[in-house]
């Protein structure tokens, strides 16, 4: 991998955007994965702009991204993009930094190692099979809501060995309202529309439960609902200990059981939320794209019939479902749940001759990178074969569905295994077509979601 240093030739001059334009659109539009606010960043590998007095650099060349996430990673930390996550889930693997992050990540790595995850396949399959069995042939339903409930049941069963109860039914509404409020809060912090001290104080108030007025009160109420739910899960385990090697027991026994209760709560809530939200979105986009591409779907159904027939999948089957896996990878390229990430420079840096001053927020528009024709020929075409051909000249940071660098999502193997199982089990019994009159609309909050769901009709095979 080539490095992004001053010794390499420039890929081109930095594009500069109007401060007034970017500030106005940050206030009025917010995030937009398409042609709006971030759409203006297309057409250049590096773009400089200011927003309400804060410096930003957007980088969309994989070499530049590689530099920030790998080569010069010690010069960059998580930005205010993660403020709403801190407000809800406190200090955790998503929001922590430095030695504390490394220590906590190390304590949890073995839980998400492939050899351990293979033993969770049965625990993943049970809730997926239950949801599939409850589907009504010919009935129209919102696949996104179904995926939220399914992925939450999988997380509850496989990682917590518990039933989340009523939270499963209410999570779709909680997540939708919470993410929309979080996007507005993030807009104030990330784009510099509010002084950082004020922003950080609001984050602390939401997290600590200090009474706040609307609309912050709604986000706080959602946080308190989730707080009660996850504390109930922890209390139940403490009252009725088990010998299972699930995530909750790992959290409670980490470092000899000396993690503070609040840290256990924060990590458990993070895995509950992040463990279902991004996967639910990824699966919703998968079913949407498969409905639009019947040839790819038919190829997948043939593979499933050949490998599985109608029997229950096993861990050994997962590696045999190459086309199914490629379809999931391509859908994550086309609509990446994690569609943008940001880092803040804590030291001066140089990227390919471009100076990055300390305090600059570096934006990585994953959605744009995933649709760059230099790395993905004919990028608007759904082509799972890209992931079977695997050209050797594609940069490693041209594909970032789980982020990259040492901060890459710890649960990526868990998520991929879960997605393959969902695609396989549900497709053994049903095909899903878009409901008449349905049109998708993207909603770019902290994650990329279908704004009005994905309305489908399931037809029994």
From Swiss-Prot:
Q: Which cysteines are joined by disulfide bonds?
A: none
Q: Which InterPro entries match?
A: Cyt_P450 (IPR001128), Cyt_P450_CS (IPR017972), Cyt_P450_E_grp-I (IPR002401), Cyt_P450_sf (IPR036396), Cytochrome_P450_Monoox (IPR050196)
Report any Pfam family annotated for this entry: p450
Q: Which terms are listed as keywords in the entry?
A: Heme, Iron, Metal-binding, Monooxygenase, Oxidoreductase
For this chain, one GO molecular function annotation is: iron ion binding
Report the cofactors: heme
Known CDD domains for this protein? CYP132-like
Regions crossing the membrane: none
Q: Which SUPFAM superfamilies does the record cross-reference, listed alphabetically?
A: Cytochrome P450
Detail which positions bind heme.
Answer: 409
State the EC number(s): 1.14.-.-
Q: What is the similarity comment for this entry? A: Belongs to the cytochrome P450 family.
**Protein name (record):** Putative cytochrome P450 132
Q: Which organism is it from?
A: Mycobacterium bovis (strain ATCC BAA-935 / AF2122/97)
């Amino acid at each position: 991998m080539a490095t992004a240093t001053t010794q390499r030739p420039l890929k081109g001059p930095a594009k500069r955007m109007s401060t007034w334009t970017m500030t106005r659109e940050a206030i009025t539009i917010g995030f937009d994965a398409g042609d709006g606010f971030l759409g203006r960043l297309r057409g250049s590998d590096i773009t400089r702009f200011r927003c309400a007095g804060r410096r930003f650099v957007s980088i969309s060349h994989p070499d530049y991204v590689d530099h920030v996430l790998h080569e010069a990673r010690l010069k960059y930390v998580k930005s205010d993009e993660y403020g709403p996550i801190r407000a809800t889930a406190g200090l955790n693997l998503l929001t922590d930094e430095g030695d504390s992050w490394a220590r906590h990540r190390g304590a949890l790595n073995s839980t998400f190692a492939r050899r351990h995850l293979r033993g969770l396949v049965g625990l993943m399959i049970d809730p997926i099979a239950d949801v599939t069995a409850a589907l009504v042939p010919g009935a129209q339903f919102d696949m996104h809501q179904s995926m939220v409930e399914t992925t939450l049941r999988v997380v509850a069963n496989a990682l917590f060995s518990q039933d989340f109860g009523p939270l499963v039914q209410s999570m779709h509404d909680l997540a939708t309202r919470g993410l929309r409020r979080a996007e507005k809060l993030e807009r104030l912090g990330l784009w510099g529309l509010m002084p950082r001290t004020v922003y950080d104080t609001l984050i602390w108030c939401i997290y600590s439960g200090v009474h706040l007025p609307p609309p912050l009160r709604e986000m706080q109420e959602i946080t308190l609902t989730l707080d009660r739910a996850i504390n109930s899960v922890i209390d139940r385990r403490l009252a009725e200990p088990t010998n299972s090697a699930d995530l909750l027991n790992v959290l409670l026994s980490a470092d000899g059981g000396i993690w503070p209760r609040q840290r256990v709560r924060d990590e458990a809530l993070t895995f509950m939320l992040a463990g279902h939200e991004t996967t639910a979105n990824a699966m919703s986009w998968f079913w949407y794209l498969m409905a639009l591409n019947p040839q790819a779907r038919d190829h997948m159904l043939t593979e499933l019939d050949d490998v599985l027939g109608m029997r229950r999948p096993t861990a050994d089957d997962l590696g045999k479902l190459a086309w199914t896996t490629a379809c999931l990878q391509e859908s994550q390229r086309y609509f990446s749940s994690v569609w943008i990430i940001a880092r803040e420079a804590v030291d001066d840096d140089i990227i390919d001759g471009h100076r990055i001053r300390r305090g600059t927020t570096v934006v990585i528009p994953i959605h744009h990178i995933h649709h760059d024709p230099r790395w993905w020929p004919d990028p608007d075409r759904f082509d799972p074969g890209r992931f079977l051909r695997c050209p050797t000249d594609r940069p490693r940071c041209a594909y970032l569905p789980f982020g990259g660098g040492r901060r890459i999502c710890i649960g990526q193997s868990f998520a991929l295994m879960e997605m393959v199982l969902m695609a396989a089990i549900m497709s053994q019994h049903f095909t899903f077509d878009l409901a008449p009159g349905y049109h998708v609309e993207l909603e770019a909050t902290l994650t990329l979601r279908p704004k009005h769901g994905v309305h489908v009709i399931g037809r029994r095979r």
